Amino acid sequence: MNKRLLFRLAPGLLAVVLFCACRPAVIEKGNLDVIPQPQEIVLAQDTTPFVINHSTTIIYPAANEKMHRTADFLATFIKEMTGTEVRVSDKEKGSNAIILAVDTTMTHPEGYKLEITPEKVLLTGGSEAGVFLPILKDGKVAAALPAGTVTDFPRFRYRGFMIDVGRHFFPVSYLKQMIDLMALHNINYFHWHLTEDQGWRIEIKKYPKLTEIGSRRDSTIIDWETKKFDGKPHSGFYTQDEAREIVRYAADRFITVVPEIDLPGHTTAALASYPELGCTGGPYKVLCSFGVFPDVLCAGNEQTLQFTKDVLDEIMDIFPSEYIHIGGDECPKSRWEKCPKCQAKIKELGIKALPKHSKENQLQTYFMSELEKEINAHGRRMLGWDEVLEGGLTPNSTIMSWRGIQGGIEAARQHHDVIMTPIQRLYFSNPRINKMTGFEWMNRVYNFEPIPAELTDAEKKFVIGTQGCIWTEWTADSTKMEWQILPRMAALSEIQWTLPEHKNFDRFMERLPEMLKIYSDLGYGYRKDVFAADTVAVKQ
């Protein structure tokens, strides 16, 4: 069976994949080249390993279907990698067993303890996810496992990765491959950026023109300096059934899909579909170039507000995520300053210019707060980019700080949850950073510290996680995508998972070759010039 297909058919590789592979019929001990680095590894003085053989049984908790599926897959994977056929059961067995267990009293739901003795392997998680995550520590399995104990848990509860499909569309099949990659790195949130000036990518049944018109553009800019276009139509969108398929696929890997509908800026594709939603009435065209553009949704138009609420209602029906991302970034106010409806709404609301917040910025806060009410009414929470700070924060919003860490600092000081994703470190499509040598390129990600030192201990608790982002203005295919992501996603995973006192860049780079082998085995491409000896940057 193809290894990549096997990996995708059923998630989970076996807790003991903390260790290296061996060939069939060869007993070989594994090593501890693990990414992300566990919090604690203690090798036993007794060097007798646990040996997987035909008498080994994988035991899962009775009546737990998730664990049953995982156990079945482990058996399949062990046979694929070692040639040994093992049994699966929900009945207790004294020895020669790999036991999967859940202990909900553990402090961390995603934490786990892995105990290996010569007689058995016991993997206990704080939840099914806690069992699943160590199962994805590696892409290989050894027939002989060194005795010892691993105690592990994540540093952050939000460990995200974002993919922009608005600028360039990627099919469901490829997104599944990316979700597998996220699972391999213990990432638990897939932030799906679904709408842009250059394309609306999700079916909304009440507004069919969003995909009939908004998902298509005539051409795409391919050279910023010469303004050269490729002259080729670009299109694509996901049906609601396909989106639900992605949600299920991710959930099977304990990953939550966070949808983003970018509002009120970056909405030219929506305006091309329904021009009455803009301040000027159009005509508008789905954009073929990239940047920040003046035409945005009209915040003073009640029809526009109803449109956005209708869209969000359908989105929340598809996506069960606690978080619903509604953008808020890069929204120019020039149209609002001259729009009679926007100015009338400012007057109606009694908005006055403030030293830190213009009237139009406060109008955006009003607009976003109305959407937040809709989101909260469904028991969800609003996520927004750090520009939503500019008009004053909405009551329960979570901030994604992208222009640096300062927005995150400001939000944390106001006791709002924060996810750090600064462009200078964690935008994997940043052209300036991608011109660095591979070693610098890796180091820049690995040594990012998400919790600013200037925050108090109480404020630091509001930094709930961090996220890498891939924007696709200049990323039109999987080769370019993977070159930019890998192996930096491995560095990201240690930021997200491993406590700072257990991190070390030199040791990380020593462990990295094992992960590179896994990428190759699973069919992913990656940037290869990432070690200290590689001093010349490679063209993308």
Where are these regions (language model features)?
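Active-site neighborhood of glycoside hydrolase catalytic domains
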Residues: 270-276, 280, 285-397, 402-414
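Acidic, contiguous N-terminal accessory segments
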Residues: 22-157, 376-385, 389, 393, ...
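Bacterial Sec-dependent N-terminal signal peptides
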Residues: 1-31
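Feature activates predominantly on carbohydrate-active enzymes
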Residues: 107-323, 370, 374, 467-472, ...
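Flexible, acidic glycine-rich loops studded with aromatic residues
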Residues: 381-397, 402-540
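Active-site beta-loop-alpha junctions enriched in small/polar residues
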Residues: 166, 195-199, 262-266, 329-333, ...
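Residue-level detector of anion-binding/catalytic polar loops
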Residues: 85, 188-189, 256, 381, ...
